[in-house]
A protein has these predicted regions:
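Ferredoxin-type iron-sulfur electron-transfer modules and their immediate structural context
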Residues: 1-12, 17-214, 218-221, 244-276, ...
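Glycine/threonine-rich phosphate-binding loop and adjacent beta-strand/alpha-helix elements that clamp
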Residues: 2-13, 535-554
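Short, amphipathic alpha-helical "lid/cap" segments that border enzyme active or binding sites
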Residues: 28-35, 39, 313, 317, ...
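A general boundary/transition motif marking the beginning of the first structured unit of a protein
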Residues: 93-97, 304, 557
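N-terminal leader/propeptide and maturation segments of large enzyme subunits in energy/redox metabolism
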Residues: 120-142, 555-583
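Catalytic alpha/large subunits of respiratory electron-transfer oxidoreductases
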Residues: 158, 164-165, 170, 228-536, ...
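Cys/His-rich Zn2+-binding cysteine-cluster or related metal-binding knuckle/ribbon modules and their
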Residues: 196-198, 223-234
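Amphipathic alpha-helical
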Residues: 209-227, 337-340, 347
C-alpha cells in the first residue's frame, strides 16, 4: 500500500487494477505513490515508502490554540454565501449558491490571517526532522511565544521559528557590514534581534535580504507590499536583474502572471551567488505601484489624460508627418532589442540614433564592448582593490568576499556606510594611496565626478595595464555604446525618447517619451508605456560585457503593443512585429 509494488519483477500497480472498482481520486493517489516509489527505485535500487513530511503545528486542534495569540488582529465575521430562495431551488436546477460579488470576495479573502510557513518546502529543520523520523510528542515542555515583527516593510521576523544558528548574525556582521542582529537575553529566553529588541527600521540595516537567504528555517522571510504570500505552486524562471550594470542572476517566482518574489537560485547560482542588493531583491515591487505607466497619456492643457494605443498611434502619425526633422533617442536603461526597434524608426527617416550628452563619458572609448562569459573573474587576478567612491551593494559584497581570502581593500572618498568598517586603509585623496602591479582600481561612473574619474584613470595608468573596473547604474551601458548614438543634438520638430525624456523636448513641436512610470510634470506631449526588465524577453550587456537576459516572467504584452504601434506607423517590417523575430 505504501509503494504500490506488486512483488512481481519491477511491476508497480494501483487504482482499479489493485483495489477493484473505486474512485478516480483514489486511482490518482495510487499513481502518485507509485511514481514516487518508482523514482526512488530507479535512483537507489531500493523499494521504500515515501517518508511522511514532518509538520510543526501550534497545536493538534484549533480549539487548543488560545484566541489571545490573535488579539493583534481585528476579528471580522465570516460572510454568508448568498443562496437561491428555498422555494425557487425546489422547482429548478439553478445553482443554489449565487456567489460573492467582487467586493465581498476580496473582503472575505482579506480575512485570512496566514497560510502556514512560506518556506515549508525548503526548510532544513523540516527536512532533517523528516529524515530522522522526529516525533514532536517526545519533546514536550515550555514554549517561548514571541510576537511576529511586521515593522519592516520588506522583512518579516518570526522569532518563534528561530533555531539560534547565528547565520544571519554572522552574515550581517562579517559580509554585509551593518551588524544589526545579535543575541539578546540569556538561557531559554535568548532571542535573535536588533539591540534592545528594536525594529530593523531603527537600525543601519541595508535591507539587502541576505539574512533571509541564509536563514535555514522560516524565521526571516520576504514581505511584499502588493501581494500576500501563499503556499500555492509558483512558476520559476531564471534571468538577470535589470536595475543596474552588475547584471546579477535572479530567480523570479510568479503566480497568475504576478511576480511574487525575486531571489537567487539555489540550484543554478550566478556569479553573485546568494547576493542581491535592496533594489534587486525588493525594488521590482515598484513596478506594481500606482504610478506605473500602463496606458498612453496625452497632455492636454498641462494635464495628462489617458488615451488608447490606437489613438496614440494616430496622434504620432499625424504629428510626425507635420515635422521637417525627427530625432530618436535611446538610453542605457533599455535593452538591445528596444534600441534596435528604435533604430528601425530612425532608419525610416534617414536619421541616426541619438542620445543625451549626459550619458557620455570620457572613458567610453576605453570600455571593451566584447561580450564576456565570466566577467567578474577579473577580481581573482588581483591582490589589492582600490575603490574610489561608492559602489553597488553586490559588487561591494563580491570585493568583501575576496578580502576575506586575504586580499587588501583600500577605500578612497567612500561615503560613510557599514562597508567602510572592512577597509584595510581609507584615504581622502587617490594620490596618497600606495599600490603595486597587483592592484585593481574600481569605481562607479555615476557616483563620482568626471574630474575624479579622470584623475583615477591617470593614476591607474601609471601602475599598469587593464587594471580598471568601471561600473555604472545603467542596465545596458556597453550595449548602448555599441549602438554608437549621436551625442551632438540640435532642436528637432519631432523628438521621441525611449527610457529617457528627449533632449530639448520643450523646444520641439511634438515630443514623445516611452517610459516605465508616470510623471505629471513630464516635459513631453505624449507618454507611452515601456516594459520593465521583468516584462519582456530581451538582451543587454552588463558593465563588464556579460550578456544578460530577460524572460518576461510577468507575461506582459506591453512590448507587443509597442511593436504593433511601430508596425502601424510603418517603422518596422511585418516580420519584425512578431515576437519570435527577436528571439
Amino acid at each position: 500500500e505504501s509503494t504500490m509494488f506488486t512483488g512481481l519483477g519491477n511491476v508497480f500497480a494501483g487504482g482499479d487494477f489493485r483495489r477493484g472498482a473505486a474512485t478516480a481520486i483514489e486511482a490518482i493517489a495510487d499513481g502518485r505513490i507509485a511514481a514516487t516509489a518508482i523514482d526512488r527505485f530507479l535512483e537507489t535500487g531500493e523499494i521504500a515508502a515515501e517518508l511522511i513530511p514532518f509538520d510543526s503545528k501550534k497545536a493538534n486542534t484549533v480549539k487548543e490554540i488560545s484566541p489571545e495569540e490573535y488579539s493583534i488582529y481585528e476579528k471580522i465575521e465570516r460572510r454568508e454565501m448568498p443562496e437561491l430562495p428555498v422555494e425557487e431551488a425546489k422547482i429548478s436546477f439553478k445553482e443554489v449558491e449565487l456567489g460573492f460579488s467582487e467586493t465581498d470576495a476580496v473582503s472575505e479573502a482579506k480575512r485570512c490571517l496566514e497560510c502556514g510557513c512560506f518556506v515549508n518546502e525548503t526548510c532544513f529543520l523540516r527536512k532533517y526532522c523528516t529524515d530522522y523520523l522526529v516525533n514532536p510528542a517526545q519533546f514536550l515542555g515550555d514554549k517561548n511565544k514571541h510576537p511576529i515583527d511586521y515593522t519592516h516593510p520588506f522583512i518579516v521576523r518570526d522569532a518563534n521559528k528561530c533555531i539560534y544558528c547565528g547565520r544571519c548574525i554572522r552574515t550581517c556582521a562579517e559580509i554585509q557590514g551593518p551588524a544589526v542582529l545579535g543575541y539578546i537575553y540569556r538561557g531559554f529566553a535568548t532571542l535573535v534581534a536588533p539591540e534592545f529588541g528594536d525594529s530593523l527600521t531603527k537600525t543601519s540595516c541595508l535591507s539587502c535580504g541576505k539574512c533571509i537567504d541564509v536563514c535555514p528555517v522560516g524565521a526571516l522571510t520576504e514581505r511584499t507590499v502588493h501581494y500576500k504570500f501563499n503556499p500555492h505552486l509558483k512558476d520559476i524562471s531564471l534571468q538577470n536583474c535589470g536595475l543596474c550594470g552588475v547584471g546579477c542572476l535572479i530567480q523570479t517566482e510568479t503566480q497568475a502572471g504576478t511576480i511574487t518574489r525575486v531571489t537567487t537560485s539555489q540550484k543554478e547560482p550566478g556569479f553573485n551567488g546568494k547576493n542581491l542588493c535592496f533594489k534587486g531583491r525588493f525594488g521590482w515591487q515598484s513596478f506594481y505601484d500606482k504610478d506605473r505607466l500602463t496606458v498612453p497619456l496625452k497632455k492636454e492643457k498641462g494635464i495628462f489624460k489617458e488615451i488608447s494605443w490606437q489613438e496614440a498611434t494616430d496622434l504620432i502619425a499625424e504629428k510626425i508627418s507635420l515635422g521637417n526633422s525627427q530625432r530618436f533617442e535611446i538610453s542605457p536603461y533599455i535593452s538591445l532589442e528596444e534600441m534596435l526597434l528604435l533604430k528601425r524608426a530612425a532608419d525610416k527617416y534617414t536619421t541616426v540614433l541619438s542620445a543625451n550628452p549626459a550619458f557620455s563619458a570620457f572613458s567610453d572609448s576605453c570600455i571593451s564592448l566584447r561580450p564576456q562569459k565570466e566577467p567578474y573573474r577579473i577580481l581573482d587576478n588581483f591582490q589589492e582593490y582600490v575603490v574610489y567612491g561608492e559602489l553597488n551593494q553586490v559588487l561591494a559584497t563580491l570585493i568583501r568576499l575576496q578580502q576575506r581570502k586575504g586580499k587588501k581593500l583600500t577605500l578612497v572618498n567612500y561615503p560613510e556606510s557599514p562597508f567602510c568598517r572592512f577597509a584595510d586603509a581609507n584615504y581622502a585623496n587617490i594620490k596618497e594611496v600606495q599600490t603595486t602591479e597587483k592592484t585593481l582600481f574600481i569605481y562607479n561612473q555615476n557616483r563620482i565626478s568626471e574630474q575624479e574619474a579622470y584623475e583615477l584613470w591617470c593614476f591607474a595608468s601609471e601602475k599598469g595595464k587593464d587594471n580598471l573596473l568601471v561600473s555604472t547604474d545603467y542596465h545596458n551601458h556597453p550595449g548602448f555604446l555599441a549602438m554608437q548614438p549621436n551625442f551632438s543634438l540640435t532642436v528637432s520638430d519631432f523628438v521621441l525618447g525611449w527610457g529617457v525624456y528627449p533632449f530639448l523636448s520643450a523646444e520641439a513641436k511634438f515630443s514623445v517619451a516611452i517610459m516605465t512610470f508616470k510623471d505629471e510634470k513630464a516635459p513631453v506631449d505624449l507618454l507611452i508605456p515601456a516594459p520593465s526588465y521583468l516584462e519582456m524577453e530581451g538582451t543587454a550587456l552588463s558593465d563588464l560585457g556579460q550578456v544578460t537576459k530577460s524572460a518576461n516572467p510577468a507575461k506582459s504584452i506591453i512590448i507587443n503593443e509597442l511593436m504593433r504601434m511601430f508596425y502601424c506607423l510603418k517603422w518596422i517590417h511585418p516580420n519584425s512585429a512578431e515576437i519570435p523575430f527577436w528571439n
